[in-house]
Amino acid sequence: MKSIQFCFFFCCWKAICCNGCELTNITITVEREECRFCISVNTTWCAGYCYTRDLVYRDPARPNIQKTCTFKELVYETVRVPGCAHHADSLYTYPVATECQCGKCDSDSTDCTVRGLGPSYCSFSEIKE
């Protein structure tokens, strides 16, 4: 019986601790309207699970904040989009997460919804790797 309890608690600990908020590699599609096509760029972003709860009874003294896996530190990198017209700005700057945390999503700098276009969305039909 003790071994079953140990296995249960170990699995719970593993699920909580090891699937936390951490850096992950992603590929995003970047585009410049003047260039008329997209390129794929590898970067890092935050993904994982954060402990959160939704209270049954609302308490005005304790605001209900849903925690999400989001960046703590960012740097920005710049890539040149090939094929742009000579007069067009061909540089594209994108964020790269360097540290993650479980916290409130900042809607001023982040798309906090599930309705975003997604990292592989391209307005144009041609994507260059």
Curated annotation (Swiss-Prot):
The keyword Signal applies. The keyword Disulfide bond applies. Its main location: secreted. InterPro entries: Cystine-knot_cytokine (IPR029034), Glyco_hormone_CN (IPR006208), Gonadotropin_bsu (IPR001545), Gonadotropin_bsu_CS (IPR018245). One of its GO terms (cellular component) is cytoplasm. GO terms for biological process: follicle-stimulating hormone signaling pathway; G protein-coupled receptor signaling pathway; regulation of signaling receptor activity. Residues 1-18 form the signal peptide. Pfam families: Cys_knot (PF00007). Glycans are attached at N25, N42. PANTHER family: FOLLITROPIN SUBUNIT BETA, GLYCOPROTEIN HORMONE BETA CHAIN. Heterodimer. The active follitropin is a heterodimer composed of an alpha chain/CGA shared with other hormones and a unique beta chain/FSHB shown here. Belongs to the glycoprotein hormones subunit beta family. Together with the alpha chain CGA constitutes follitropin, the follicle-stimulating hormone, and provides its biological specificity to the hormone heterodimer. Binds FSHR, a G protein-coupled receptor, on target cells to activate downstream signaling pathways. Follitropin is involved in follicle development and spermatogenesis in reproductive organs. This is Follitropin subunit beta. It comes from Cavia porcellus (Guinea pig). The lineage of its organism: Eukaryota, Metazoa, Chordata, Craniata, Vertebrata. The gene is FSHB.
